Amino acid sequence: MSLTTHRNELHSDFDNYTAKKELRRALVSEQRGLCCYCMARISAERGRMKIEHWHCQAHYPAEQLSYRNLLGACLGEEGKPYELQHCDTRKGNQDLRWNPANFDVSSQLSYRLDGTIESDHGEFNRQVNEVLNLNVPFLKNNRKGVLDAVLEWWKHHRHAPKGRIKRKIDKYAPTGGQLTPFCQVAIWWLSRKLARIR
C-alpha cells in the first residue's frame, strides 16, 4: 500500500503503515545505500537502518506519512550513551534547518585531514556537531580513512591530467548503483584539486 493511499484511510499514522519493508527499499535505493546524514552504509533490512522523519513525528504529525519528509538513516549507535549517538538517533525530536534530500548539503561542508566535518555557516556547523553529532570518533575515523586513501593516490598522481582526476571522482560517484561509504570526503577533496588545475 502506498503512503498516499494509507494517508487517506481513517486513523492512519506511520506506526500502522504496513509497507515499511518496501519503503525502506525505496529510501535505500534513492540514497544509493548511504545514510542521509553521515554517509555510512545502510541496507533495507529491518534492524539495519531507520526510517527518519526529517520533520519529527512529535512536532509535525501531519508530515509523518509524507514521502518527501522521509529519509533512510543509519542506526546511529542506538542504545549507546548520548555522547556516542549520531544521526537520527541523536537528533530525536530536534529540528534541522536543512533537509539533505532537498538541499545541496555538500556545498556547505568541508573536511579536515583528521576526518572532522565542518561548515563555515555557523548554524549549519552547530547542527552538524550538536544535533547530528557527526564528529564522533567512529565517523571521523571512517572519513579519515577515505581521505588517507585519496591522499595516498594523490602522492602518485599529483601531475595527472584533469581527465584522470575526473575518472577518479567518477569512481566515488558512479552514475548508478550504490555509492562508496563516506565518498563525499573524496569527492570534495579531489574536486578542490581539480578546480586548481589550469
Listing of model-derived features with the role each one plays in the protein:
Residues 30-33, 49, 67-69, 104:
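Short connector loops at helix/strand junctions that flank enzyme active sites
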Residues 103, 108-110, 119-130:
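Acidic, Ser/Thr/Gly/Pro-rich intrinsically disordered interaction regions
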Residues 60-68, 79-115:
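Polybasic, low-complexity binding patches
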Residues 19-20, 31-41, 48-51:
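Glycine-enriched, solvent-exposed interface loops adjoining structured elements
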Residues 122-198:
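C-terminal, charged low-complexity interaction regions
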Residues 40-85:
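Histidine-centered nuclease catalytic patch
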Residues 1-34, 60-65:
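Short, charged surface segments at domain edges that flank catalytic/cofactor-binding sites
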Residues 36-37, 50, 73, 108-111, ...:
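A structural signal for short, well-ordered beta-strand segments and their strand-loop junctions
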